[in-house]
Swiss-Prot record:
Belongs to the complex I subunit 2 family. Keywords: Chloroplast, Membrane, NAD, NADP, Plastid, Plastoquinone, Quinone, Thylakoid, Translocase, Transmembrane, Transmembrane helix, Transport. It comes from the Eukaryota. It catalyses: a plastoquinone + NADH + (n+1) H(+)(in) = a plastoquinol + NAD(+) + n H(+)(out); a plastoquinone + NADPH + (n+1) H(+)(in) = a plastoquinol + NADP(+) + n H(+)(out). GO terms for cellular component: chloroplast thylakoid membrane. It is a multi-pass membrane protein. It comes from Muilla maritima (Sea muilla). Pfam families: Ndh2_N (PF19530), Proton_antipo_M (PF00361). This is NAD(P)H-quinone oxidoreductase subunit 2, chloroplastic. One of its GO terms (biological process) is ATP synthesis coupled electron transport. The keyword Chloroplast applies.
Length: 510
């Protein structure tokens, strides 16, 4: 009898929860329509996987890519609509959030074709891989629009859990297991520190969780200049720092880059930074409005350490992926300049523009690494020597992406850095910009060192890996080539494209 009563209560409680969720989706679903498209794509993937065999693998790629493209289309149709706060204040929709969501969707759309050949060659499980990628994308999108502390914590955890699973996807690889373990342990520790900072904000504001209400609560309780705010600021900076991976919170980055499957590294290298940057701008700009001098100082220290350590250590690396890991640490230092400047001197606009270029430069480079690695089985920089003699197209495209990452004119990376540094200079960040300029010169050195290896024509310097290198017989139909071509074109866009891109970015400012 007791069991029947408990069972009935469980069914009633479950029904109430389901009806509440359905009610929220019915009345607020239009505000998260791009996210709903991805959720539908996830459900469709699971249904097809449970009812079909491995011969339907092309459908998995098609469904994933189509759902991402449709989500991008939904975002574009919603452009310039009035800002809306939905789900009882948990989620905010505005142009600023949507531009970051667009960047995350763009990353995922380019990463899926980049992964096709790798998955087929390594015989990885395709459905789970795509499910993790789409779920991580979904978590990143919700993080961009998060408007309260709970959503800001849950959304990145959704992204992080999928990231842990993706980084350890090749479970028979010892390096992958090591990378996943370090990633998981440090991620769990950083999440705990982040929640600790949120608890201070919650208590000091009188029990508020919405970002704007926290500011009002701090004013009402007169706690906006209390020592507790400093503790909250430091804790939250450490928590977000793990996601952005600036120095000294970068310890996980080189190992995860080296041990994880290369398409996974390509995905994580850009999406995590875009989502974390979107979250950082809102958290620092709204709840810590009265502590702007303090968080500016903290971010300046992180930017300087990242630009110096990232670029100097990258010079000494022999692995291509580890070199890009330290390079990405230096790159996030440049992005932090835009966060510090804020919207007063087009800091956010320049940051968004540079991140758009960084996506194309970084994914283009990783597309070349995937292609070369599948045909040679090596990641050592020395093994790229003489690649131009065997595959000029691959060598030239890799060289263009590396030069753009270094910021050489007239490539897109140069104009992105130029505008970012100019905004920093106008805001009075003279020392920070000077460090950025010097470290950019350092980065050009190690990029040019790789390009010199690519273009060498002396037989004694050509490695056995390149001598035995075979070009893809299906080059025109190769999905990696498609993704790489898009990235290379975007990386070499001349400066004439800067004005319309900046104008769009400036329209997003909240």
């Amino acid at each position: 009898m007791i069991w029947h009563v408990q069972n009935e209560n469980f069914i009633l409680d479950s029904t109430r929860i389901f009806m509440k969720a359905f009610h929220l989706l019915l009345f607020h679903g239009s505000f998260i329509f791009p996210e709903c498209i991805l959720i539908f794509g996830l459900i469709l993937l699971l249904m097809i996987d449970s009812t079909s065999d491995q011969k339907d693998r092309p459908w998995f790629y098609f469904i994933s890519s189509t759902s991402l493209v449709m989500s991008i289309t939904a975002l574009l149709f919603r452009w310039k609509e009035e800002p809306i706060i939905s789900f009882s204040g948990n989620f905010q929709t505005n142009n600023f959030n949507e531009i970051f969501q667009f960047l995350i969707l763009l990353c995922s759309t380019l990463c899926i074709p980049l992964s096709v050949e790798y998955i087929e060659c390594t015989e990885m499980a395709i459905t789970e891989f795509l499910l993790f990628v789409l779920t991580a994308t979904l978590g990143g999108m919700f993080l961009c629009g998060a408007n309260d502390l709970i959503t800001i914590f849950v959304a990145p955890e959704c992204f992080s859990l999928c990231s842990y699973l993706l980084s350890g996807y090749t479970k028979r690889d010892v390096r992958s297991n090591e990378a996943t373990t370090k990633y998981l342990l440090m991620g769990g520790a950083s999440s705990s520190i982040l929640v600790h900072g949120f608890s201070w904000l919650y208590g000091l504001s009188g029990g508020e969780i919405e970002l704007q209400e926290i500011v009002n609560g701090l004013i009402n309780t007169q706690m906006y200049n209390s020592p507790g705010i400093s503790i909250a600021l430091i804790s939250i900076t450490v928590g977000i720092g793990f996601k952005l991976s600036p120095a000294p919170f970068h310890q996980w980055t080189p190992d995860v880059y080296e041990g994880s499957p290369t398409p996974v590294v390509a995905f994580l290298s850009v999406t995590s930074k875009v989502a974390a940057s979107a979250s950082a701008t809102r958290i620092f700009d709204i709840p810590f409005y009265f502590s702007s001098n303090e968080w500016h100082l903290l971010l300046e220290i992180l930017a300087i350490l990242s630009m110096i350590l990232g670029n100097l250590i990258a010079i000494t690396q022999t692995s291509m992926k580890r070199m890009l890991a330290y390079s990405s640490i230096g790159q996030i230092g440049y992005v932090i300049i835009g966060i510090i400047v804020g919207d007063s001197n087009d800091g956010y606009a320049s940051m968004i523009t540079y991140m758009l270029f960084y996506i194309s430069m970084n994914l283009g480079t990783f597309a070349r690494i995937v292609s070369f690695g599948l045909r040679t089985g090596t990641d050592n920089i020395r093994d790229y020597a003489g690649l131009y003699t065997k595959d000029p197209f691959l060598a030239l495209s890799l060289a263009l992406c590396l030069l753009s990452l270094g910021g050489l004119p007239p490539l897109a990376g140069f104009f992105g850095k130029l505008h970012l540094f100019w905004c920093g200079w106008q805001a009075g960040l003279y020392f920070l910009v000077s460090i950025g300029l010097l470290t950019s010169v350092v980065s050009i050195y190690y990029y040019l060192k790789i390009i010199k290896l690519l273009m060498t024509g002396r037989n004694q310097e050509i490695t056995p890996h390149v001598r035995n290198y075979r070009r893809s017989p299906l080059r025109s139909n190769n999905s990696i080539e498609w993704s790489m071509t898009v990235c290379v074109i975007a990386s070499t866009i001349p400066g004439i494209s800067m004005n319309p891109i900046l104008a769009i970015a400036q329209d997003t400012l909240f």
